[in-house]
Curated annotation (Swiss-Prot):
Keywords linked to the UniProt accession: Cytoplasm, DNA damage, DNA excision, DNA repair, Excision nuclease, SOS response
Subunit structure: Interacts with UvrB in an incision complex.
Cellular location(s): Cytoplasm
Gene (name only): uvrC
NCBIfam families: PRK00558.1-5, uvrC
UniProt GO cellular component terms: cytoplasm; excinuclease repair complex
Pfam families named in the record: GIY-YIG (PF01541), UVR (PF02151), UvrC_RNaseH (PF22920), UvrC_RNaseH_dom (PF08459)
Protein name: UvrABC system protein C
Sample GO molecular function, one term: excinuclease ABC activity
Domain GIY-YIG: 13-91
Physiological role: The UvrABC repair system catalyzes the recognition and processing of DNA lesions. UvrC both incises the 5' and 3' sides of the lesion. The N-terminal half is responsible for the 3' incision and the C-terminal half is responsible for the 5' incision.
Amino acid sequence: MFDAKAFLADVPHLPGVYRMYDAKNTIIYVGKAKDLKKRLSSYFRSQLASKKTEALVANIHHIETTITHSETEALLLEHNYIKENQPKYNVLLRDDKSYPYILLTKHQHPRITSFRGSKKVAGEYFGPYPNAGAVRETLNLLQKLFPIRQCEDSYYKNRSRPCLQYQIGRCLAPCVEGYYSQAEYDNQVNLVRLFLQGKDGQVVEHLVQKMENAAQELDFEAAARFRDQIQSVRAVQEKQFVSNERLDDLDIISIAYQHGIACVHILFVRHGKVLGNRSYFPKVPNNTDLTELADTFVGQFYLQMNQHRTIPNQIIIDQPLSEATALANVLSEQAGHKVSIADKNIRGDKSRYLALAKTNAEAALTLQLKQDTHIRQRYDSLKALLNLAEIKRMECFDISHTMGNQTVASCVVFDENGPLKSDYRRFNIEGITGGDDYAAMEQALLKRYGRHLEEEKIPDIIFIDGGKGQLNRALETFASLNVSWDKRKPLLIGVAKGVERKAGLETLLISKWDKEIHLPPDSPALHLIQHIRDESHNHAITGHRKKRQKAFTESGLESIAGVGAKRRQALLKYLGGMQGVKSATLEEIQSVPGISKQLAEVIFDTLQHS
């Protein structure tokens, strides 16, 4: 029993962070406070604020505190602890992806392209965009409006005549001299810059001036080109919501919460334009109040989830934040510019955007609730079928190869909410007879389970995509494991496809019963098994294809003396892949940077006689 009175006697009235541990020495909650003594004392009153707090306090074994210089420092430390430990009773945002940007490169003839990751490439970055699809859509639009290049620098350097993009009017062909001047290209680059900054009006004004100048000089062909550009830009403007207010960089957040599931929807506005939107479904402990959810989400989203995320000038949210001022100060320091947080009195076009975010949040939550209902029905059906009290984690294995070559095994994981893609794994299978699926499965299982596993990582069910032979090999492999965790816990099930290999005709081979089960095609349990089996199959095939493609592109070059990884990469890049290398002339191979005349002859002769 935790002695709260003795513990609180030594806690100071200072700002800091506290970490609550259970009997297994696992951190179950992380919090911060302006006054540690006051905050921690509130957990041990006779009447607690919520059932969530009651459950938390009942599991406390001991508490550790860290004193900080300020509330701001405590806020940062709190989110670092949450990210590192993923405590059970904290709201957890499960999203660690970098966000894509549009990059205008620093070059004599800049290119526009998508970019993801640390901003190490020289140039101007616009974004972030919520997903790769939004970037592709914008790049396609830019290519139609402004004819500047999107090709790789290696492709650009090796052109001797304009490519198809020039012929269809989507590039000025700066790679070849004599088609357009540097000034004309720079002008189009500047228009792209203005457009991405949301200054559409300036783009139109500039093009109108250019059109009028061309007409006065009787260059009617150029005037017609500018006229077409003006019409295209105006057509884009008409499709967009045009605000009378000055809307710079905003993130607009709305939270919908129902039946223990939360949806946080964000509209990303940059330079007055909505770049896109995204819905998040954080893991929320039961009976969490909305203020805590809003506080934790905003803190995690901007402070801990991704170092490349751009922090906007203003964050608008439809739920009150208890720590808005402290959070705004921290974000301002992180961003290098003033960041404000508004959670009330939102008016004008910002109010309209917030209403749009709310509509999207509610719609996404409704859809998620329906999906969760289907998932629960399927899990309940499978639990009843197998006579299991609970199913918290399932894993499924599949093997993929082409005639025994480039064999890959996949392992996919489902938890109570469906696919847990962050835990998916692939295994390269080596040292076996080609086409021996039993040996491949054994190797995959040994790689996956022949090591220490935390209790929560031990699956309740392991599905093996295959018949009785595969299942028996899997059982033998498990029997041979020498591990500290309970290897008897997982129930192994073989999923045989049947003679016609059609969905709905699967046979289940249940290891603990040593019998076969045929489920009706409309069985929710069967649908869940088909889902995890298909996920595993697709994951294996994707991995196998990547491995096969890599072997194909590298074959023929690895064996040549003097051709290492860098030269091999240069040959493939400059000559357009392995097919381009094989069909290249001696002179073309010699023109690749880093390839001498002597080495080019060796490469050419080797490929011609291979």
